[in-house]
């Protein structure tokens, strides 16, 4: 039987595709660069369409290869972004804690997920730029948590600049996806096998003869 598409070859146990979505300028590319390369820059060029990075991590003794796609937040690239939803196993919804409109638009991004992504896709809410001075904060932590609770998803505040919770957010969603895949494997293995026995030809012939005689 063919292996499920998320499974690995020799160098990893699981291949997990993640998608970063959210408005332009919320720091998706910075989060990706911090997690994949351990670096931060303020001179990012706005993502045009789609970009991705790969990082392999270890969880519970398993090697997890993360393929992380960074999407453009601009409206004109929305159709490109939605084309990548279907294959995503986990989606990080990112907003800027200093930009209330980016937070309010999270509901629109969730509607896009509901329209285009798989039903069982894992989601996580990320409030980025948490290192900014409190006087610049437009979205209180409690408000972000309340939205996450409303949708039944996890919530983290992060800073790509200071590396606050960046590892934690990616490891958290990867762990949840790995568990979902493992549970799916367990259910498949637990399904009883069905054996089809060959028909008793003599019995069938007798039945056919009896039916003939009775007609």
From Swiss-Prot:
Grouped into one coarse class, the protein's main location is membrane
For the keyword Iron, the answer is no
Which cellular compartments is it found in? Cell membrane
Lipid-acceptor residues (S-geranylgeranyl cysteine): 212-213
Task: State the InterPro entries in the record.
Answer: P-loop_NTPase, Small_GTP-bd, Small_GTPase, Small_GTPase_Rab
The keyword Nucleotide-binding appears for this protein:
yes
Provide the alphabetized UniProt keywords. Cell membrane, GTP-binding, Lipoprotein, Membrane, Nucleotide-binding, Prenylation
Per its UniProt record, what Gene3D superfamilies does this chain match? P-loop containing nucleotide triphosphate hydrolases
Example GO CC term: the record gives: plasma membrane
Q: Which domain of life is it from?
A: Eukaryota
SUPFAM superfamilies attached to this UniProt entry: P-loop containing nucleoside triphosphate hydrolases
Q: Which PROSITE patterns match?
A: RAB
**One protein family per Pfam:** Ras
Q: What family does the entry list? A: Belongs to the small GTPase superfamily. Rab family.
Q: What is the name of this protein?
A: Ras-related protein RAB1BV
Originating organism:
Beta vulgaris
Taxonomic lineage is:
Eukaryota, Viridiplantae, Streptophyta, Embryophyta, Tracheophyta
Gene behind this protein: RAB1BV
């Amino acid at each position: 039987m063919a292996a499920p598409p998320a499974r690995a070859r020799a160098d990893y146990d699981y291949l997990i595709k993640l998608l970063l979505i959210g408005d332009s300028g919320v720091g998706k590319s910075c989060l990706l660069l911090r997690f994949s390369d351990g670096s931060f820059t303020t001179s990012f060029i706005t993502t045009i369409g789609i970009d991705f990075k790969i990082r392999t991590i270890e969880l519970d003794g398993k090697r997890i290869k993360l393929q992380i796609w960074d999407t453009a937040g601009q409206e004109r690239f929305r159709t490109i972004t939605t084309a990548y939803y279907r294959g995503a196993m986990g989606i990080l919804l990112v907003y800027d804690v200093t930009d209330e409109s980016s937070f309010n638009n999270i509901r629109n991004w969730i509607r896009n997920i509901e329209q285009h992504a798989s039903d069982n896709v894992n989601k996580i809410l990320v409030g980025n730029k948490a290192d900014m001075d409190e006087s610049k904060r437009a979205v209180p932590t409690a408000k972000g948590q309340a939205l996450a609770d409303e949708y039944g998803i996890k919530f983290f505040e992060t800073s790509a600049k200071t590396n606050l919770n960046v590892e934690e957010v990616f490891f958290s969603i990867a762990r949840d996806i790995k568990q979902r895949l493992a549970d799916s494997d367990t259910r498949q293995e637990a399904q009883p096998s069905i054996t089809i026995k060959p028909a008793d030809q003599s019995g069938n012939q007798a039945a056919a003869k009896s039916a003939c005689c009775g007609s």
